[in-house]
Amino acid sequence: MRTENEYKGSNPTTSKMDQSQTSAFFEVQGKVKDFSYAGSVGMTRAWFKESEEDHAYYTFTPTVRLSYNLKKAGFLRYRFNISPAIPSLGSLTDVEQAMDTIQIVRGNPLLKTYQQFTNSLSYSYSKKQFNANLSVRHQYYDNPIMESIFVEDGKLILKDENQRSFQSLNTELMAGINGATLFGLKDFLTLYASGGYTRSWSEGLNYSHMYDEFYYSVMAQVQYKG
């Protein structure tokens, strides 16, 4: 695949890039009584070339899924996976683009791919029309690509760089009833409510941020069949 980008301005530039990607994948799964398991692994090679410079990225993508049937007490599920993030063609381009009189977006051919690690654990329970689910998820990005902003020769430079890390922790609870009979009307009401909390940490090359978020939602639906 080939992409061609033309940047116009005081210094017009044409950037041409070639790209190819090759992947292989393998999966195995099984079950022992109430315990189920599955595992998969993939390997991907991504290649980019601009002018005389080329970059090759190799990514490893394993996934593990486990589940246990607690029968009347519900289901317990666990999932772990590693997924790669490859720099975009636009970020790799060795080009400066003026956004206005003071802001310049600068490409970075030295960007490296990074890994995203995700662990998730969930418990679900249902009885008749009642359903509930509790989940916990943790994500960790190792040397993620995030924007750096700095001043150079009186200009504000915006540049993607591999930073130190990013991680988030999320907990969410959902509960509701589906098709409940109300006022003698069968399957009249469906009601669900959910709420959660997320904490995120960003560790840059010369900065750090922490962000907390609480959220909730309520969904109600009534249905009448004459």
Q: Residue locations for each model-derived region?
A:
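Repeated loop/turn-to-beta-strand initiation elements of outer-membrane beta-barrel proteins
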Residues: 34-39, 72-76, 129-132, 181-191, ...
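Surface-exposed extracellular loop regions of Gram-negative outer-membrane beta-barrel proteins
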Residues: 17-53, 57-67, 188-197, 216-226
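A short, compositionally biased micro-patch
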Residues: 69-71, 114
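Outer-membrane beta-barrel signature, preferentially recognizing the C-terminal barrel domain
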Residues: 17, 84-133, 140, 158-174, ...
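Outer membrane beta-barrel strand-and-loop segments of large Gram-negative receptors
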Residues: 112, 131-223
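Transmembrane beta-strands of outer-membrane beta-barrel pores
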Residues: 2, 32-34, 43-49, 56, ...
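Membrane-embedded beta-strand positions in outer-membrane beta-barrel channels/transporters
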Residues: 21-27, 61-63, 77, 108, ...
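Outer-membrane beta-barrel translocator domains and adjoining extracellular loop/strand segments
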Residues: 2-13, 49-57, 89-97, 102-104, ...
